[in-house]
A protein has these predicted regions:
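N-terminal beta1-alpha1-beta2 submodule of the flavodoxin-like/Rossmannoid cofactor-binding fold
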Residues: 1-61, 66, 161-171
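FMN-binding flavodoxin-like domain, especially the glycine-rich phosphate-binding loop
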Residues: 44-171
Length: 171
Protein backbone atom coordinates (compact mmCIF):
# COMPACT_ATOMS: atom_id res chain seq x y z
CA UNK A 1 0.00 0.00 0.00
CA UNK A 2 2.91 2.36 0.69
CA UNK A 3 5.42 0.91 -1.74
CA UNK A 4 8.08 -1.22 -0.04
CA UNK A 5 6.72 -4.56 -1.23
CA UNK A 6 6.14 -3.19 -4.73
CA UNK A 7 9.72 -1.86 -4.91
CA UNK A 8 11.10 -5.24 -3.81
CA UNK A 9 8.81 -7.08 -6.26
CA UNK A 10 9.88 -4.88 -9.17
CA UNK A 11 13.57 -5.36 -8.35
CA UNK A 12 13.05 -9.12 -8.00
CA UNK A 13 11.26 -9.15 -11.35
CA UNK A 14 14.17 -7.29 -12.98
CA UNK A 15 16.63 -9.82 -11.62
CA UNK A 16 14.67 -13.02 -12.30
CA UNK A 17 12.35 -12.28 -15.21
CA UNK A 18 9.34 -13.34 -13.13
CA UNK A 19 6.58 -10.76 -13.69
CA UNK A 20 5.59 -8.64 -10.70
CA UNK A 21 1.79 -8.64 -10.41
CA UNK A 22 -0.41 -7.04 -7.75
CA UNK A 23 -2.29 -9.51 -5.57
CA UNK A 24 -5.44 -7.79 -6.85
CA UNK A 25 -4.62 -9.02 -10.38
CA UNK A 26 -3.04 -12.38 -9.50
CA UNK A 27 -3.50 -15.04 -12.18
CA UNK A 28 -4.33 -18.70 -11.57
CA UNK A 29 -1.27 -20.09 -9.79
CA UNK A 30 -1.91 -23.81 -10.22
CA UNK A 31 0.24 -24.19 -13.34
CA UNK A 32 3.23 -22.21 -12.06
CA UNK A 33 6.37 -24.11 -11.08
CA UNK A 34 7.50 -21.30 -8.75
CA UNK A 35 5.08 -19.03 -6.91
CA UNK A 36 6.62 -16.04 -5.12
CA UNK A 37 4.38 -13.92 -2.92
CA UNK A 38 5.74 -10.64 -1.53
CA UNK A 39 3.39 -8.97 0.91
CA UNK A 40 3.43 -6.19 3.45
CA UNK A 41 2.87 -6.94 7.11
CA UNK A 42 -0.09 -4.99 8.50
CA UNK A 43 -1.72 -5.48 11.89
CA UNK A 44 -0.59 -9.07 12.28
CA UNK A 45 -1.25 -10.21 8.73
CA UNK A 46 0.23 -10.15 5.25
CA UNK A 47 -1.72 -7.91 2.89
CA UNK A 48 -3.59 -9.88 0.21
CA UNK A 49 -2.09 -13.26 1.14
CA UNK A 50 -5.32 -15.04 2.05
CA UNK A 51 -7.07 -13.76 -1.08
CA UNK A 52 -4.23 -14.72 -3.40
CA UNK A 53 -3.68 -18.22 -2.03
CA UNK A 54 -7.32 -19.07 -1.25
CA UNK A 55 -7.88 -22.61 -2.47
CA UNK A 56 -4.24 -23.00 -3.51
CA UNK A 57 -2.54 -26.29 -2.73
CA UNK A 58 1.08 -26.97 -3.47
CA UNK A 59 1.52 -29.72 -6.06
CA UNK A 60 4.54 -32.02 -6.39
CA UNK A 61 7.38 -30.12 -7.99
CA UNK A 62 5.85 -26.74 -7.21
CA UNK A 63 7.73 -24.27 -5.06
CA UNK A 64 6.06 -21.62 -2.87
CA UNK A 65 8.17 -18.73 -1.64
CA UNK A 66 6.56 -16.34 0.84
CA UNK A 67 8.26 -13.01 1.43
CA UNK A 68 6.99 -10.65 4.12
CA UNK A 69 7.95 -6.98 4.14
CA UNK A 70 7.75 -4.93 7.30
CA UNK A 71 9.61 -2.82 9.79
CA UNK A 72 10.36 -5.67 12.20
CA UNK A 73 14.00 -6.75 12.26
CA UNK A 74 14.17 -10.36 11.00
CA UNK A 75 17.40 -10.86 12.96
CA UNK A 76 15.30 -10.91 16.15
CA UNK A 77 13.90 -14.40 16.83
CA UNK A 78 10.83 -12.98 18.55
CA UNK A 79 9.96 -11.06 15.37
CA UNK A 80 10.40 -14.19 13.25
CA UNK A 81 8.11 -16.13 15.58
CA UNK A 82 5.46 -13.38 15.38
CA UNK A 83 5.64 -13.25 11.58
CA UNK A 84 5.35 -17.03 11.28
CA UNK A 85 2.37 -16.99 13.66
CA UNK A 86 0.65 -14.38 11.47
CA UNK A 87 1.25 -16.56 8.40
CA UNK A 88 -0.34 -19.53 10.19
CA UNK A 89 -3.46 -17.41 10.86
CA UNK A 90 -3.85 -16.77 7.13
CA UNK A 91 -2.78 -20.06 5.56
CA UNK A 92 -2.99 -23.73 6.41
CA UNK A 93 -0.19 -25.06 8.57
CA UNK A 94 0.68 -27.53 5.81
CA UNK A 95 1.14 -24.74 3.26
CA UNK A 96 3.26 -22.61 5.62
CA UNK A 97 5.42 -25.62 6.51
CA UNK A 98 6.08 -26.45 2.84
CA UNK A 99 6.78 -22.84 1.84
CA UNK A 100 10.19 -21.24 1.92
CA UNK A 101 9.71 -18.08 4.02
CA UNK A 102 11.80 -14.91 3.89
CA UNK A 103 11.49 -11.57 5.63
CA UNK A 104 12.58 -8.18 4.29
CA UNK A 105 12.60 -4.82 5.98
CA UNK A 106 10.64 -1.98 4.45
CA UNK A 107 10.06 1.68 5.10
CA UNK A 108 7.53 4.00 6.68
CA UNK A 109 6.85 7.70 6.34
CA UNK A 110 4.29 8.71 8.93
CA UNK A 111 3.42 11.86 6.95
CA UNK A 112 2.26 9.71 4.02
CA UNK A 113 0.08 7.32 6.01
CA UNK A 114 -3.66 7.48 5.54
CA UNK A 115 -5.62 9.12 8.35
CA UNK A 116 -6.79 5.70 9.50
CA UNK A 117 -3.29 4.24 9.62
CA UNK A 118 -1.89 7.35 11.34
CA UNK A 119 -4.62 7.09 13.97
CA UNK A 120 -3.94 3.39 14.58
CA UNK A 121 -0.19 4.04 14.86
CA UNK A 122 -0.77 6.94 17.26
CA UNK A 123 -3.01 4.81 19.48
CA UNK A 124 -0.45 1.99 19.42
CA UNK A 125 2.36 4.42 20.25
CA UNK A 126 0.41 5.93 23.16
CA UNK A 127 -0.40 2.46 24.48
CA UNK A 128 3.22 1.29 24.24
CA UNK A 129 4.55 4.40 25.98
CA UNK A 130 2.71 3.32 29.14
CA UNK A 131 4.68 0.06 29.34
CA UNK A 132 8.08 0.21 31.09
CA UNK A 133 10.93 0.05 28.55
CA UNK A 134 12.40 -3.10 30.12
CA UNK A 135 9.13 -4.93 29.44
CA UNK A 136 8.95 -3.88 25.77
CA UNK A 137 9.63 -6.31 22.95
CA UNK A 138 12.41 -5.43 20.50
CA UNK A 139 9.79 -4.64 17.86
CA UNK A 140 7.89 -2.33 20.20
CA UNK A 141 11.07 -0.54 21.30
CA UNK A 142 11.90 0.10 17.67
CA UNK A 143 8.40 1.45 17.02
CA UNK A 144 8.75 3.82 19.99
CA UNK A 145 12.14 5.04 18.74
CA UNK A 146 11.01 5.65 15.16
CA UNK A 147 7.44 6.88 15.72
CA UNK A 148 6.59 9.94 13.65
CA UNK A 149 9.77 9.74 11.59
CA UNK A 150 10.59 8.69 8.06
CA UNK A 151 12.47 5.39 8.27
CA UNK A 152 13.78 3.28 5.38
CA UNK A 153 15.32 -0.14 5.99
CA UNK A 154 14.98 -1.23 2.33
CA UNK A 155 17.98 -3.32 1.25
CA UNK A 156 17.82 -4.85 -2.22
CA UNK A 157 20.86 -7.03 -1.41
CA UNK A 158 18.51 -8.99 0.86
CA UNK A 159 16.88 -10.35 -2.32
CA UNK A 160 19.99 -12.50 -2.96
CA UNK A 161 18.87 -15.56 -0.94
CA UNK A 162 15.39 -15.34 -2.49
CA UNK A 163 16.85 -15.29 -6.00
CA UNK A 164 19.03 -18.29 -5.11
CA UNK A 165 15.94 -20.15 -3.87
CA UNK A 166 14.03 -19.30 -7.07
CA UNK A 167 16.92 -20.57 -9.16
CA UNK A 168 17.06 -23.78 -7.14
CA UNK A 169 20.42 -23.08 -5.53
CA UNK A 170 20.86 -24.34 -2.01
CA UNK A 171 20.96 -21.57 0.55
Amino acid sequence: QYGSSRRYAEKLSEQTGIPAVSYKDAPDLSGRSVVVYLGSLYAGGVLGLSKTLRGFSLQDGQKLILVTVGLADPCEQENLDNIRASLRKQLSEKLVDRAKVFHLRGRIDYQKLSLGHRTVMKLLYQSLRRIPMEKQTAENRELLETYGKRVDFTDFRALGPIISEIQGKTI
